[in-house]
């Protein structure tokens, strides 16, 4: 089951609801062992949630985690002391607004309050009309997992959320969900970072998988491959 509250993101309130649902299901259905939760890293990052803490809460509550969708949200940091640069950053961020998918946005304002918008154009308009109010935007746009920056230094990814997720898995040998790379937005990336053809997209997907492998390897989460023994060596 993939939690889908408004905007398809799991806040602490929805996390409690998910835990309550699984407790009810486990108590009432003898087939509950076939049901598990699907956890989307991008969604948690957009909500300013700590993925490791969320996963720890689920594990401690006995909620089975069947799948983790590895996805990289976009983070935009707006320079409040440079209005002209802020305009430039918003202009480039606007190139990620497209009609195929909704790109929900969460922002933390200068007072620490959270503001949300259903799609990127509304967030851009709010930031343009209230310069300096929102120093950081988090955008539900699945960028390649290995991307630390896109086009401008102010436009980055939420790799810290992915690191929190991998660190959780490294700490708990009893949690081994399916890991699914969920970057579905290659074809709608802005032209400067969009794959030029199918082969380029295949290379991007390959590089994502290699990046994930390296993160797992660093945390000793990959089983060593058995050494091949060729018949002519026997």
Predicted features along the sequence, with ranges:
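Flexible, acidic glycine-rich loops studded with aromatic residues
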Residues: 64, 115-224
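Eukaryotic N-terminal low-complexity, Ser/Thr- and Lys/Arg-rich leader segments
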Residues: 227-234
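Residue-level marker of intrinsically disordered, low-complexity segments enriched
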Residues: 87-90, 150, 227
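Generic marker of "main functional regions" within proteins
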Residues: 49, 75-80, 106, 111, ...
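Acidic/histidine-rich catalytic cores of soluble enzymes
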Residues: 1-128, 134, 143
